[in-house]
């Protein structure tokens, strides 16, 4: 890797940890808060320096448009969208009624026009997060989680799943005899689901996050 200053290495390592933990990079404001910078502008300066050194790629105008370069063991990374792509129109899913599809018309409260560069891969919908069970992964109450519909997910990915009558956001880990849905907050218990349980259905994986007020 290109030689980095100590501060640049801190920023790079923070980005890597965030992607490993949640599947998407931090915002400038989150970098500034974590590393004690005076403002997000200071974080932006370090990001531009890292981009000039060829260790990250930045997508213009996207608060989470950061990709690490030259890293082979980052399974959650995707190619950043090219500038100039048309905006995506994404449905926002509110509360989901038991037994009905998550994208049923009655669950969609509105549509948002979103820049594709906000996301690591093309999402199918936005889900409003309720609660703080994923707080330590940077996912807070009221955030909009970008979700790509999937029927399979890898260990460690953050997923949206239907569990009985509820829809939940958790980290997926396979265990002997089933799967564990892991909360990223010690105040919440993990959930073990037995293999073949009719109560469980995977709805999709997280491919981005929009903080409340960013749209």
From Swiss-Prot:
Catalytic activity: Hydrolysis of Ala-|-Gly bond in repressor LexA
Active site residues of this protein: 133, 170
EC numbers: 3.4.21.88
Ranges in a coiled coil: none
Residues in the DNA-binding region annotation: 28-48
Domain of life: Bacteria
GO biological process, one term: negative regulation of DNA-templated transcription
Keywords tagged on the record: Autocatalytic cleavage, DNA damage, DNA repair, DNA replication, DNA-binding, Hydrolase, Repressor, SOS response, Transcription, Transcription regulation
GO-annotated molecular function: DNA binding; serine-type endopeptidase activity
Pfam families reported for this sequence: LexA_DNA_bind (PF01726), Peptidase_S24 (PF00717)
Chain positions of site Cleavage: 98-99
Subunit structure: Homodimer.
HAMAP family reported for this sequence: LexA
Reported function: Represses a number of genes involved in the response to DNA damage (SOS response), including recA and lexA. In the presence of single-stranded DNA, RecA interacts with LexA causing an autocatalytic cleavage which disrupts the DNA-binding part of LexA, leading to derepression of the SOS regulon and eventually DNA repair.
Entry's family note: Belongs to the peptidase S24 family.
Name of protein: LexA repressor
Source species: Burkholderia vietnamiensis (strain G4 / LMG 22486)
